[in-house]
From Swiss-Prot:
GO cellular component assignments: cytosol; plasma membrane
Gene Ontology terms for molecular function: 3-octaprenyl-4-hydroxybenzoate carboxy-lyase activity; metal ion binding
Species assigned in the record: Klebsiella pneumoniae subsp. pneumoniae (strain ATCC 700721 / MGH 78578)
Name of the protein this chain belongs to: 3-octaprenyl-4-hydroxybenzoate carboxy-lyase
Subcellular location field: Cell membrane
Gene name tied to this protein: ubiD
């Protein structure tokens, strides 16, 4: 399934009962969050609020509120199919030349997909059907949500921020929250290591005193949105990956006021600039951790133009204690990560990021252990191989007889196969999420690895326990008479 734009995707969701239109007036201030949160926790549909109080523009929430909708957005039927997306990314990250004609034939589908990587630049586009500029720019006319009672101000959450460094041909797409502070002013909360912030730093060094162009796309097609949150290789642009997912080249258009290229079918595009030195205190905001984060200073984004489609839809979300939409995305993208990790570490059987671990702060790995110390090698690999896991605080490694997605299994392995002193690895002074207030220093903290594998010679001097296993023949005999026993049948 391929979608030309967000509206194509909404049509399909509605046909499948995965979209609910809300006609009752609902306030973007707190009320939409309350409804969206209850709906997501119940595994409910995406929500289109057609009459937000005080606004004429509808609000779309919970678009990716179930793993299946994430899979649908990536052009797959179910979550398990996302492993194929991961295999494609693993191939693109470290391509292997064909070993012969048969191997070449087997790889043809992957090579064919690569043809969809270049973007297609349009002269005119739906996202520029209406152009607002100058004094007419007023962000207060967009139904930007206030999600939690102590939030500082309305907050844009699903904006795809487009930037380009002074020496780069390729653009960067990143999702950074943006606090509304004026009719044409937003605070761009990007951390210093993120792509947009790096582009800005390079711009300030190369062109001191010049304004840094920025554009933000809201309501792009699902492949482009998900391309911005997927672990694409550094050599691959998010637009290129979206083309791979969609099966057609990503259509882009040059912005009205700068040379950046934005998704042609986006519902709304904000164009403007950031000036070096113009900063403002951002926050506090309720975040995906379930807490309000501290106030900090970030650059101010001045919006000079708003372009949009006729009857534009504002795409938004909320973040809070899991489950929320980022947690659901984490569950789905988990399947993408597995083949990428397995390409580098074939001994990995499964990899799981429990949603209650705030999407990435805790990982469980199961592996086919082959030698003493092997589990520690895998721990270090998880922390270092993909930048998405540089903030993972806890890595639990188990043998392949443990189900990584079953806490009963994992806790059993931890409590029976671990000695706390011997099998715990502590690493100090490592990068930690800025939002992690538990770390002693902002952005810098420790990590813990738990080796819950069976211990090999060299790791222990004791005779190691053998897991109890049932007799298969007895199990088969009891299976045959189980219904006849009627143990659970009502009298």
């Amino acid at each position: 399934m391929k979608y030309h734009d967000l509206r194509d995707f909404l049509t399909l969701l509605e046909q499948q009962g995965e979209l609910k239109r809300i006609t009752l007036p609902v306030d973007p201030h707190l009320e939409i969050t309350e409804i969206a949160d209850r709906t997501l926790r119940a595994g409910g549909p995406a929500l289109l609020f057609e009459n937000p109080k005080g606004y004429t523009m509808p609000v779309l929430c919970n678009l990716f509120g179930t793993p299946r909708r994430v899979a649908l957005g990536m052009g797959q039927e179910d979550v398990s199919s996302l492993r194929e997306v991961g295999k494609l990314l693993a191939f693109l990250k470290e391509p292997e030349p064909p070993k012969g004609f048969r191997d070449l034939f087997d790889k043809l589908p992957q090579f064919k997909q690569v043809l969809n990587m270049p973007t297609k630049r349009l002269r005119g586009a739906p996202c520029q059907q209406k152009i607002i500029q100058g004094d007419d720019v007023d962000l207060n006319k967009i139904p930007i949500m206030t999600c939690w009672p102590e939030d500082a101000a309305p907050l844009i959450t699903w904006g795809l921020t487009v930037t380009r460094g002074p020496h780069k041909e390729r653009q960067n797409l990143g999702i950074y929250r943006q606090q509304l502070i004026g009719k044409n002013k937003l605070i761009m909360r990007w951390l210093s290591h993120r792509g947009g912030a790096l582009d800005f730093q390079e711009w300030c060094a190369a062109r001191p005193g010049e304004r840094f162009p920025v554009s933000v796309a809201l309501g792009a097609d699902p492949a482009t949105i998900l391309g911005a949150v997927t672990p694409v290789p550094d050599t691959l642009s998010e637009y290129a990956f979206a083309g791979l997912l969609r099966g057609t080249k990503t259509e882009v258009v040059k912005c009205v006021s700068n040379d950046l290229e934005v998704p042609a079918s986006a519902e709304i595009v904000l164009e403007g600039y950031i000036e070096a030195g113009e900063m403002a205190p951002e926050g506090p905001y309720g975040d995906h951790t379930g807490y309000y984060n501290e106030v900090d200073s970030f650059p101010v984004f001045t919006v000079t133009h708003i372009t949009q489609r006729e009857d534009a839809i504002y795409h938004s979300t909320y973040t809070g204690r899991p489950p929320d939409e980022p947690a659901v995305l984490g569950v789905a993208l988990n399947e993408v990560f597995v083949p990428i990790l397995q390409k580098q570490f074939p001994e990995i059987v499964d990899f799981y990021l429990p949603p209650e671990g705030c999407s990435y702060r805790l990982a469980v790995v199961t592996m086919k252990k082959q030698y003493a110390g092997h589990a520690k090698r895998v721990m270090m690999g998880v922390w270092s191989f993909l930048r998405q896991f540089m903030y993972t605080k806890f890595v639990i490694v188990c043998d392949d007889d443990v189900n990584a997605r079953d806490w009963n299994d994992v806790i059993w392995a931890i409590t029976t196969r671990m000695d706390p002193a011997r099998d715990t690895v502590l690493v100090e002074n490592t990068p930690i999420d800025y939002l992690d207030f538990a770390s002693p220093v902002s952005g810098l903290g420790s990590k813990m690895g738990l080796d819950a594998t069976n211990k090999w010679p060299g790791e222990t001097q004791r005779e190691w326990g053998r897991p109890i296993k049932k007799d298969p023949a007895v199990t088969a005999r009891i299976d045959a008479i189980w219904d006849e026993l009627a143990i659970f049948k009502q009298q």
